[in-house]
């Protein structure tokens, strides 16, 4: 099966709010597992369980947004959005939520603070790209860029990635994101310049 087989040509993207996530949660976890529990990431199945827990928490946060690409895009509602009613595989997704103010210190946020110093406060209220995943069968067709662009639209956004995984920094560099630092096992990117 190819990305075109899964997506019926060019995948249709649809935007979901947090209240809509429970209906697609299992499909997102399946795609996450296919992406991150295989090379080049090689995460453990326990990491997929942790992703499901994080997803549940993120979806309850005000301002959470998910952008999905799936085969269900061929069926649309009155607004022209894919309905997803048939449970089609998710070929890719991007997840984001507003960054709290003041900038958090838990999880990887402390490493981001150490890398950016005082400029980190600029990221408060920006959209944090919490996850971007493209199913292996749908890669190399521009879907990752489309998902990222749809998620961030005209909003200031930031993300972190793991530079030791082949292709991650090349992807964001080629997509025009601005690299702001590498250290502590992460690389930080924004889609616009930071105020210093």
Where are these regions (language model features)?
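Conserved N-terminal entry element of GNAT/NAT acetyltransferase domains
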Residues: 1-26, 30, 34
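Helix-loop element at the rim of GNAT/NAT acetyltransferase active sites that forms part
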Residues: 29-45
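A short helix-loop-beta-strand connector motif used in the catalytic cores of GNAT acetyltransferases and
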Residues: 53-71, 98-106, 128
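Conserved beta-hairpin
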Residues: 63-94, 135
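Conserved acyl-donor/pantetheine-binding loop and adjacent beta-alpha core of acyl/acetyltransferases
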Residues: 95-131
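Conserved GNAT acetyl-CoA-binding A-motif
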Residues: 126-127, 153-165
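Conserved acetyl-CoA-binding loop-helix of GNAT-fold acetyltransferases
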Residues: 131-153, 173-174
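Conserved active-site alpha-helix within GNAT-family acetyltransferase domains
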Residues: 145-146, 163-185
